[in-house]
């Protein structure tokens, strides 16, 4: 049985929550996020908190309730504080630049790589080898970071490539003759 679902999600001041059946909208200073909740979960709004309860007749209702609580908590944090993800480019000649909502990457290919950012996500480059992604939706931030990393994943011998700032790349030893 999930213990996560038993804790309510506290709604801070300045955040507006709308319940419309199974569709929940959360609006704050960083924008508005909407999510459809699984049928096995019943969400109730009480004063300044959201509570979660499983519905009868579903085998995985407690698990779904815990997942829903975690997702809605991430939405509340996203519209109040926002999320950031940092990427590093390691390698000779690997550079990044941001022009509007397009991230331009030079990753050792014969052509530059242009990645279009989705709505609600902003990027900035404090240096040529760093990218900082910011936005309200935790899932979209993670997906964009994974897409950028997928262009040139860190290779295991020298560690060159695009990596998360907190990622530790284990390097192998080169083959000896």
Swiss-Prot record:
GO terms for biological process: cytoplasmic translation. Keywords: Ribonucleoprotein, Ribosomal protein, RNA-binding, rRNA-binding. The keyword Membrane does not apply. GO terms for cellular component: cytosolic large ribosomal subunit. InterPro entries: Ribosomal_uL6-like, Ribosomal_uL6-like_a/b-dom_sf, Ribosomal_uL6_a/b-dom, Ribosomal_uL6_bac-type, Ribosomal_uL6_CS. GO terms for molecular function: rRNA binding; structural constituent of ribosome. It comes from the Bacteria. The keyword Lipid metabolism does not apply. NCBIfam families: L6_bact (TIGR03654). Belongs to the universal ribosomal protein uL6 family. This protein binds to the 23S rRNA, and is important in its secondary structure. It is located near the subunit interface in the base of the L7/L12 stalk, and near the tRNA binding site of the peptidyltransferase center. Part of the 50S ribosomal subunit. This is Large ribosomal subunit protein uL6. It comes from Serratia proteamaculans (strain 568). The gene is rplF.
